[in-house]
């Protein structure tokens, strides 16, 4: 894969320990020193996420806690300590990774109800959420259809509809 693999998405990384991911990353970097790994950690407790960004295990993880908070802040129209919590998490991960951690921000993904449905069709709330996560530091990921306000609630077939290219 040396000439072809630059990015790898690693779902549900919590089923392996951080030492395993550190070894995996080292092996990937032997093939391509510029490899970009993104880990999916469904973990609301940021203290339990630290080992995955520590000592070079992963430098990028999807931040599910942040995604939930962004949606909540936008929908409720109240900060509720969000900014101070965010700064605390960024400091914690930055320290643990020797400044190499980059957050991977998103609002929803292929396993979740779509943003516009979560916002109950409120376009202003959806735009507020988008404005927040698109201006945060790190790497932004947009689930297809979010940019045009697609709606959809679980089950999966309702959130994985084809993109309406001609509407």
Model regions and ranges:
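Active-site and adjacent substrate-binding regions of carbohydrate-active enzymes
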Residues: 1-167
